[in-house]
Amino acid sequence: MRLSSLWFGLVFSLSGAVAIADVPADPAKVQALKVGDAAPAFSGLSVDGVERTFPAGAYAKPTVVIFYRGGWCPYCNLQLADLRLVEPRLRASGFEVVFLSTDRPELLYSSLKEKDIHYTLLSDHHSAAAEAFRVAYRLDDATLAELREYGIDVEATTGTKRHELPVPSVFVIDKAGVIRFVYSNPDYTVRLGADALWSAASGLAAR
């Protein structure tokens, strides 16, 4: 019995190691899921630590999934502020709009520079959702050191030692769970704007 338990633990550990090994160390090598791919099941934690789950195969409504790095990132704050121009229109058109970052649940709102934001922010601090959508990448030691010089401790903000972030990405997914639009850019300073997101999603909303 003990031997079988040890074997199970070994298999589990190896599978986890394989998953981490599959995450590129260079954001330019990230290959996000594509238009026409089935969206994976994913989940995230609310600021209260409540898990929100999105099963694969079918969603209750068309869904926009937005990956951003964290509330500590100035470009993320600019993007979240810009998307206030379109997020209410998306919801009024029947979309679920979900924002995922690697921030710990308790940091989701408190870390933002702009406080007047009422989005559905979910914590993906273990990067499981980012890995499932294939937008995660590993930070090398030089990048971690550079971030620390700016007062950003990724282990503290995520609560893990995984040293992963998502490439900023946007997925528009239909009710059948099929990805209909993808924006993913390894240059974290360039983000999808509100007008472009509405153009991408409005056609699906009209169906």
Summary of predicted features, one role per range:
Residues 4-17:
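Bacterial N-terminal signal peptides
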Residues 23-56:
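N-terminal "domain-start" segment that seeds a small globular fold
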Residues 39-40, 62, 167-169:
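Short loop/turn microsegments at loop-to-beta-strand junctions
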Residues 55-81:
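Short active-site neighborhood of thiol/selenol oxidoreductases, capturing the structured segment around
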Residues 59, 70, 102-103, 126-127, ...:
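Solvent-exposed coil/turn segments that connect beta secondary-structure elements
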Residues 78-134:
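Structural microenvironment flanking redox-active thiols in thiol-disulfide oxidoreductases
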Residues 124-189:
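Thiol/selenol-based redox catalytic cores and closely related redox-interacting motifs
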Residues 188-203:
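A short, polar/charged loop-to-alpha-helix boundary motif
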